[in-house]
Amino acid sequence: MNLGKRLLVMLAALAIATFFSAKTKTLSRNRIDENGFPRIVLWAWERPEDLSTFDPQRFAVAFLAQTLILKGDDVVLTPRHQPLKVRPEAKLIAVTRIESQKTTGERPALIDLQRQKLVMLIMRTLELKNVSALQIDFDAASSERLFYRSLLQELRQKLPDKVPLSMTALASFCVGDRWLQDLPVDEAVPMIFRMGADDQAIKRFLAHREDFREPLCRRSYGIALDEPFEAKFDTSRRLYLFNNRSWMTSDIAALEERTPR
């Protein structure tokens, strides 16, 4: 085979490899769907919650299981203290909130031992009753992103293959920041509430039927029950709902107005 033909073959092979690589990224797994989670997930934060009246066929529950604070070269654990009541058949996601400089006022060391301790503590939440998925909630400063990426990579490697791994993401990350690309998670839930300075710009962006540029952010939405939002939701995506108080049966009516069946 002469040089010209060999070059054509190599280019064709590269094109095919690129095509299938793109297809693989587009069709990456979503273990949350594979595990049959309902389309609506109620966030249950650190307060007493009685969700036993909510239909587990329609609602899953993502509850705050623990808060982990990166302080210096240590990890400080604060477990959940408030009671959570759900139906026995409810699908549960254990949420770990990770905090650092905004809470402590000092930069964390971000060393390997901290990452390993985080992984160990997060893995333990999988042992809680009826938990079948994990979610990580954090605010990643630019200087912390490599640390969080390595944390998620190690966590995914240690988790059983079928267990979903979810994370929350600032909506601004989903619109114009590519650091989420290729993270080993099943979804990055865009937090479309309490957005501060970005609030109006992002809500206008979505109201004009624009979509998040990051594919991991196109599998779900995160909204608050007490914040008006005019964008039309893609009904194929999962909806995470935050309430600024304990959930009550009367909230179902408000849910019906905000969420598609």
Please tell me what each predicted stretch does.
Residues 61, 136, 188:
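Conserved, mostly hydrophobic/aromatic
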Residues 156-224:
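Substrate-binding surface in catalytic domains of secreted glycosidases
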Residues 35-38, 71-185:
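Chitinase-like catalytic core of GlcNAc-active glycosidases
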Residues 1-11:
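N-terminal Sec-pathway targeting helices
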Residues 22-58, 62-64, 77-80, 90, ...:
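Boundary/entry segment of secreted carbohydrate-active catalytic domains
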